[in-house]
């Protein structure tokens, strides 16, 4: 599994702001979008381009254009919605495939409750977004579903990742790529990432 910890100064600065205990919903939400955008920039750096001739203001102009790549953004509900716009800033024509997962707080296992996916997943690069890669259970279940529907190329964007989740995801899906703003220390007894961001979903949506 390809794992990239994006160490750009802007990413580190913005993620650091998100770790503050007293951060407002507005600021957390905006920063989640901004970091998601920067991760997207990194994750799409290997997209293949081709030369195309277009009509320019002074005649024919040769330009580079992304070559035949269809993309679907896959936010894992609900917190993944907070990163979705960051991807769409760069790929506004991407289809949106939604997967609903929540974590059973007693067993820490993922529980699926909703899915609405692009009809042609076998032709698309899927960019899965979720702020936290903790135990890895929800991400593994989501990728299982995408592969069952025919998706062949999958990239994952997360704000923070725990070593435990990385290990589990690599064991289940060694063929994917993961881009994160930080590999944090560990999971606590409640399954939260330390130092992490707290409950990203609550902070994005202003709920408790």
From Swiss-Prot:
CDD domains: PRTases_typeI. Pathway: Pyrimidine metabolism; UMP biosynthesis via salvage pathway; UMP from uracil: step 1/1. One of its GO terms (biological process) is UMP salvage. PANTHER family: ADENINE PHOSPHORIBOSYLTRANSFERASE (PTHR32315), URACIL PHOSPHORIBOSYLTRANSFERASE, CHLOROPLASTIC (PTHR32315:SF4). One of its GO terms (molecular function) is magnesium ion binding. Its cofactor is Mg(2+). The lineage of its organism: Bacteria, Pseudomonadati, Pseudomonadota, Gammaproteobacteria, Pasteurellales. 5-phospho-alpha-D-ribose 1-diphosphate binds at residues 78, 103, 130-138, 199. Catalyzes the conversion of uracil and 5-phospho-alpha-D-ribose 1-diphosphate (PRPP) to UMP and diphosphate. Uracil binds at residues 193, 198-200. Binds 1 Mg(2+) ion per subunit. The magnesium is bound as Mg-PRPP. This is Uracil phosphoribosyltransferase. Belongs to the UPRTase family. It comes from Actinobacillus succinogenes (strain ATCC 55618 / DSM 22257 / CCUG 43843 / 130Z).
């Amino acid at each position: 599994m390809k794992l990239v910890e994006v160490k750009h100064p802007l990413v580190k600065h913005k993620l650091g702001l998100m770790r503050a205990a007293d951060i407002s919903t507005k600021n957390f939400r905006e920063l989640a979008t901004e970091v998601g955008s920067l991760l997207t920039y990194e994750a799409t750096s290997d997209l293949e381009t081709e030369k195309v001739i277009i009509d320019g203001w002074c005649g024919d102009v040769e330009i580079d254009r992304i070559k035949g790549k269809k993309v679907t953004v896959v936010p894992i509900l609900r917190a993944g919605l907070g990163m979705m716009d960051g991807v769409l800033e760069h790929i506004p024509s991407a289809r949106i495939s939604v997967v609903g997962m929540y974590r059973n707080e007693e067993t820490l296992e993922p529980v699926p409750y909703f899915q609405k996916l692009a009809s042609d997943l076998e032709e698309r690069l899927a960019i899965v977004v979720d702020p936290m890669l903790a135990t890895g259970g929800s991400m593994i279940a989501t990728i299982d579903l995408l592969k069952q529907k025919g998706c062949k190329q999958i990239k994952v964007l997360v704000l923070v990742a725990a070593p435990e989740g990385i290990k589990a995801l690599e064991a289940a899906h060694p063929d994917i790529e993961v881009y994160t703003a930080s590999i944090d220390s560990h999971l606590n007894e409640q399954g939260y990432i330390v130092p992490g961001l707290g409950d990203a979903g609550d902070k994005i949506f202003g709920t408790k």
